[in-house]
Each structure stands twice: as C-alpha cells, then as structure tokens.
Amino acid sequence: HDVVLVAGQGDGKMWDMVSERVVKEHCPHLQRSLSLKNDLLAIWELRRIYKRHSPDVVHLHSSKAGVLGRMVFPRKRSIYTVHGFDSVRIANRRFLPVEKLLQRRCSAIVAVSNYDERNLRNEGITHNVSTVYNGIAVPDVSNLMDMPELQRYKKVVLSIARVMPQKLPKLFIDVARLLPDYGFVWIGNLEEVTEYGELPANCHFVGNIPNAGAYCSQADLFMLASNYEGLPMVIIEAMSMGLPVVASDVGGVSEIVRNDINGY
C-alpha cells in the first residue's frame, strides 16, 4: 500500500525524518491559528490532494486538520483521532459545538485514553467513539549527541515537550533550583528560554532534537508536568527505556503511570 502524509508548512525536522517510502504533500495554508482566508484555502488544497491520490483511508488528527479534513473528505473513508480532548473541553471550550457538529462526518472517532473517551461521551460526542492507546517504535539509541556536561550530576531528570504554559516549564525550573546536585534537561524548546529569568546552573534547555525519546537512555528519571494531556507519547517512550516517571495526574496519564509502581 501507499502512504501519503499531509502537513502544513512541511519545513520542520520531523518532516525531514519521514521515510522516503512515504509520499509527502504540503498544504501551506493548513495552520494552527484561526484565519477564514487560510482555512478556506486549506480546504481547497486538501480537496486537490484528495483528488490526486484518491485514498482508501484518511486518518485525521486533532485539532485543525481534524476539523477541516472532516469538511472535505468522505465520511466513510475518514477516521479521526483526538489527541487530548481536554484541549477543547477545558482550554478551548468555544470549539466544542464544532466538534459536536462534525462528529458524524467520519466513520470513527478514536480517543487515546479511557479518560478522553469518557469525557467525549459526557459532552455528547458519542458517534462510533472508542479508545485505542498510543503506540511507539522503541527509540533508536545508536546515534545520540554527547552531553558530557551531564556526567557531573548525581542523577539526570529529563523532560521532552514544547515550551508553552500547558507544559509548566516554570515548575520544571523551580524543581531544578531545589535539587542543585541533579541535572535537569529539557528537550523541545525552539528558541532560547529567557522569559523565566536566569536559569539555575543545573537546568539545561537544549533545543529541538530529532529522535528526542532516545535520550531517555541517558537519564535517570522522566518528568512531565502539564495542565492537560491525552496520552503522552514521551511518557510511553520513557517507560520503554525503563525510566521511572513523575508526571501530572491529567488526561490518561494515570492509565499508564501507576503510583509507587512505575512512577508518581
């Protein structure tokens, strides 16, 4: 079978990592922010891509692609995965009517945790909803960037996330200040982190690194603080490396992190 991957700008590191066997399609106007002009142009671009490939199955992911895609693609060929329903239910509740309206514009809605499925149903989104947990390929640890500065610490605490309020980076920094003998490493920042004042000497924001999950092999503990989640892939990657996990009890996290057993 052939696989076609559609993305917005298509200029990030993840785009370059996609297998050569995958057909890559740009949809330049598919953007995170709301814009009537860009969204209408994205719908037109998605229609052209659909006609070009005539796919048997269309797998849509939240949020923007899930909305526009359900407007464009045939219902019977479309599956929609919700990666963390709290991003709508709590953080952007004004979009809830749109999700309700479009729920029948796909053949199935996939929640990534029982928590999300339960909340989808409680909010009236009940059409062919089921839970399928996220899966991963175990990260390849053969070609990792050296971080010799971490060897001086008793333990290394790793977090992998975008730097945004949802992910509570200030809490990560505050914990680092409390434990100066431990090294704290954050992978995922796109630019220098300056908005939280001077970082403690043991706190390192190292940027957006390809194959980030593989660096769990160089850590002693994985930490993910967050206001809301679906079922974080980074936690699953950390667990695949045998790391204990300290994470906020949000979304489906407690379905995989068992307190006092494999984390806290």
Predicted regions and their residues:
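A conserved mid-protein helix/loop that constitutes part of the nucleotide-sugar donor-binding site
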Residues: 155, 159-178
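Donor nucleotide-sugar binding/catalytic pocket of nucleotide-sugar-dependent glycosyltransferases
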Residues: 25-26, 104-143
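Acidic anion/phosphate-binding donor-loop and adjacent secondary structure
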Residues: 34-37, 90, 121-122, 135-153
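N-terminal strand-loop element at the rim of the active site
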Residues: 1-38, 119-121, 129-131, 190-192
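Aromatic "clamp/platform" in nucleotide-sugar-dependent glycosyltransferases that forms part
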Residues: 208, 227
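Glycosyltransferase donor-sugar binding loop
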Residues: 5-12, 136, 160-164, 183-195, ...
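Short hydrophobic beta-strand element within catalytic cores of glycosyltransferases
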Residues: 235, 244-247, 257
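Short His-centered aromatic/hydrophobic patch
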Residues: 60-66, 82
